């Protein structure tokens, strides 16, 4: 319990003692300095997540960084099996990225503010209209030059293989005409969810970024089943992680 207590304690410390930035970032946004706000917030979150991962005992191996375009925002599409996916992935993405998250997370006030600072969005999958509005907003962020992350399974899964991907979530890339970077994540559940008693234990985490997918050049038939194609690539890549 010591490791997870340290992680949660540090996160609480971070959320409380960074409150002054709420007013600073709000003023920056009013003055048209949203990019400055994002860069500042992303750097602070990157550092905080790095500390949390160290406290949890995570050893992270990242492959495929060269596949990430340096001059273009992208939609990262990955599997989701642990709370630590978010920490490990954000810490591994150059410059960070906003996450499309379940609306349950918006119920935590201090966390909600910091998620907004790094352009995270909250989606209610039961409300079709709100869900579509979130997808359009995510696409707009991509057009504005901010990368985004989505987990098309819709929720965390501890099954050996990712659940089926919701194809509609990939419309974000189509609307923005932005490339997709598939992401395979392994080992994060070994940090927490696979352990009894909500205990964090040291584990090796593997993250692989796949080659960019240009959705504008895909035939309609391939685009229709793109989620399934990415899911299979993730399954195959995770097998390599575990070999």
Predicted regions and their residues:
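Amphipathic coiled-coil/heptad-repeat helices and related helical stalk/stem segments
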Residues: 61, 82, 107, 134-135, ...
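Short gly/ser/thr-rich secondary-structure transition/capping motifs
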Residues: 55-63, 131-132, 189-192
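A short, well-structured juxtamembrane/interface segment
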Residues: 51-73
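Short, basic, glycine/proline-bearing loop/turn elements
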Residues: 49, 120-124, 154-155
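Catalytic core of membrane glycerolipid acyltransferases/transacylases, capturing the structured
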Residues: 22-33, 37-43, 55, 70-128
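N-terminal membrane-anchoring alpha-helices
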Residues: 1-59
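Non-catalytic C-terminal accessory region of glycerolipid acyltransferases
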Residues: 4, 132-243
């Amino acid at each position: 319990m010591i490791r997870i207590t340290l992680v949660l304690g540090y996160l609480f410390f971070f959320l409380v003692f960074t409150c002054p930035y709420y007013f600073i970032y709000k003023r920056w946004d009013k003055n048209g300095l949203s990019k400055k706000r994002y860069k500042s917030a992303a750097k602070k979150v990157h550092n905080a997540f790095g500390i949390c991962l160290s406290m949890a005992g995570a050893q992270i191996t990242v492959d495929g960084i060269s596949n990430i375009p340096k001059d273009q925002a992208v939609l990262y599409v990955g599997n989701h099996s642990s709370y630590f996916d978010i920490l490990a992935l954000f810490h591994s993405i150059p410059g960070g990225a906003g996450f499309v998250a379940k609306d349950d997370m918006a119920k935590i006030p201090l966390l909600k503010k910091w998620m907004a600072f790094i352009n995270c969005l909250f989606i209610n999958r039961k409300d079709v209209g709100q869900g579509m509005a979130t997808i359009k907003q995510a696409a707009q962020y991509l057009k504005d030059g901010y990368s985004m992350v989505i987990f098309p399974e819709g929720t965390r899964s501890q099954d050996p293989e990712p659940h089926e991907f919701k194809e509609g979530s990939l419309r974000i890339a189509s609307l923005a005409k932005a490339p997709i970077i598939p992401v395979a994540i392994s080992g994060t559940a070994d940090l927490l969810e696979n352990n009894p008693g909500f205990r964090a234990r040291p584990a090796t985490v593997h993250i692989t970024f796949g080659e960019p997918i240009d959705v504008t050049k895909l035939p309609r038939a391939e685009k229709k089943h793109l989620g399934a194609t990415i899911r299979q690539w993730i399954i195959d890549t995770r097998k390599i992680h575990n070999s």
